[in-house]
Amino acid sequence: MKIINPILPIIENILGNLTALQAEGKITTQPIERVALQWYESERNILRKTTNTGREVAFRLLKEGQRLKHDDVVFISDELVIAIEILPSDVIVLSPKTLPEMARACYEIGNKHSPLFLDGDEVTLPYDKPMFEWLQAAGFHPQKAERRLSQALRANSAQGHGHSHSHSHDHHGYHHHGDGHWHKH
């Protein structure tokens, strides 16, 4: 096996999904290294992380709409594959029974500036105790679970938008600076 230069080129593109690239025969016997990301890191355009083996990887994803998802492949060579792992996190899960209930839930959650994610027929959002309690009081029957947040709805505050309100609520240390990039200091 050839020794790979530990410094990779800057990652500027997502090459495809791991399962699809394996089915196409583009990934065969190469070892697969993972870059673990929190859900809020997947929105960042510029990012520096390390793989599970300690290899440093730099991302510069400047194309519109590029967002890292679980099992995205960002590097392929004859000796190595690097794929993304979105780490599971505590989430609120809603299972609306009707389209009007889905619309109301999304509207109300979006109005509170929380990022929304789709997981099949369910709506998920990062766990926040005040939000969970508000959803219970509003009759939505939320559940707490641990899941990967990866299919973000595009028209909400997690993507950033141009207005703000003078109020605050607890995001358990996660916040953004009006740019939609949630993070923790």
Curated annotation (Swiss-Prot):
One Gene Ontology molecular-function label: nickel cation binding
Pfam families: UreE_C, UreE_N
Biased composition range(s): Basic residues: 162-175
Biased composition (Basic and acidic residues): 176-185
Subcellular location per the Swiss-Prot or TrEMBL entry: Cytoplasm
GO cellular component terms listed in the entry, alphabetical order: cytoplasm
CDD domains: UreE (cd00571)
Main location: cytoplasm
Segments for region (Disordered): 153-185
InterPro entries, per database record: UreE, UreE_C_dom, UreE_N, UreE_N_sf
Gene Ontology biological process terms, A to Z: protein folding; protein-containing complex assembly; urea metabolic process
Record keywords: Chaperone, Cytoplasm, Nickel, Nickel insertion
Xref: NCBIfam families: PRK13261.1-6 (NF009754)
Function: Involved in urease metallocenter assembly. Binds nickel. Probably functions as a nickel donor during metallocenter assembly.
Family, as annotated: Belongs to the UreE family.
Protein name: Urease accessory protein UreE
Organism: Haemophilus influenzae (strain ATCC 51907 / DSM 11121 / KW20 / Rd)
